[in-house]
Amino acid sequence: MSDEFPAICDSCCGPDKHIKMMRQANGEECKVCTRPFTVFRWNPNNGTNKSKKTIICMTCARARNCCQSCMLDITYGIPLEIRDTALKMAGLEHASQIKSSNTSQNREVKAIMADKQEAKYNNEDNDVNKSNDRSEMARDILSKLSEKLNGNTNALIKKAPKNSKTTKKNEIINVKNADISKILGKLPLGGSIVVPETTPELSSFFLFGFSDDIPQYIISDFCNKFGKIKSLSIVHRAKCGYVVFTTRKAAESFATTIMENGLNKNTATPGLLILNNKYPVRVSWGKQKPLVTTNEECHKLSLVITKVMRQLAEKDKIFEDQKITKKAKNHKTSSDANEHSSNTASTQHYKALRPDFEL
């Protein structure tokens, strides 16, 4: 399959008509299939001064019909899980479609499946006998979903003049005005990793604070060490997600391991976990809730989570300092008590059993 040009949505490309890209052959591992792929990097010039890059290979992007950078539907800009669920409810799911959540946890199996899929795409001819009615129905459903979730931002971007300073300014304002207060109120950012006895049916965790370039298989491989995973939902752009275990026993084993890794002396804050010795992740018990969907909400939530990560680090440092101070104070009190006891013993006077007398 050709790697001359990536599959990128309009939102990731930015408002400019011409963009400069850097191409690196076999630059990184695909986040889905773990195979090396050609990475593209560019600056979208959308007012954020943050460069973008492709994070999945062309084969996985084509199988999911998604953008190689943001992993949203490349046509309608909606999350893949919502898209697939809507099409499934309407009875329009494709039989050969690879689901966005890969059930295999083995790296070699993922790579083999991707190789087969790539060979299939290279050999297949365009199917001209697809049902036009079903395609039209699917497009209608996805268009309505896009309007509801994104506020019809795709249409606004297409109509807006390119290379316009007003467009860039409006994009920044949209990010600032994105309301995520209701979503934040449901997220256990101040939770704990201590096993809750009051909710024995709970077997899910809220993960947050990880880097947006962490491969999802690193998280899934670590979680699978403790038992079978029911679902793993990660939103890289928002730096958060949920993992749900099939059994409570597996969930408790997962929590206990994090508590005993030597990084969580303060049990009042979410547990800290370091994956692959370079990806810090905070973990807390929490029932799975809907996460953000639009680009503006994801960006704003990622900023909030970054701030929360700094606050949690400061709390852990204060807790550690207080613990050291208390220990030193107790040691000093113990030393003073021993010294006082020693001085008391040295000042004791001789007391004769009988009255002294002078010869």
Curated annotation (Swiss-Prot):
Region annotated Disordered, chain positions: 324-359
Ranges of Polar residues composition bias in the record: 340-349
Localisation: Nucleus
InterPro entries referenced in this protein's UniProt entry, alphabetically: Cwc2/Slt11, Nucleotide-bd_a/b_plait_sf, RBD_domain_sf, Slt11_RRM, STL11/RBM22-like_N
Keyword GTP-binding among record annotations: no
Membrane-spanning intervals of the chain: none
Keywords attached to this entry: mRNA processing, mRNA splicing, Nucleus, RNA-binding, Spliceosome
GO molecular function (one): pre-mRNA binding
Claim: Zinc is one of the keywords in the record: no
Main location: nucleus
CDD domains: RRM_SLT11
Gene Ontology CC entries for this record: Prp19 complex; U2-type catalytic step 1 spliceosome; U2-type catalytic step 2 spliceosome
Gene3D superfamilies in the cross-refs: 3.30.70.330
One BP annotation, GO: RNA splicing
Task performed by this protein: Involved in pre-mRNA splicing. Facilitates the cooperative formation of U2/U6 helix II in association with stem II in the spliceosome. Binds to RNA.
Family: Belongs to the SLT11 family.
PANTHER family: PRE-MRNA-SPLICING FACTOR RBM22
Subunit and interaction comment: Associated with the spliceosome.
Name the record gives this protein: Pre-mRNA-splicing factor SLT11
Gene: SLT11
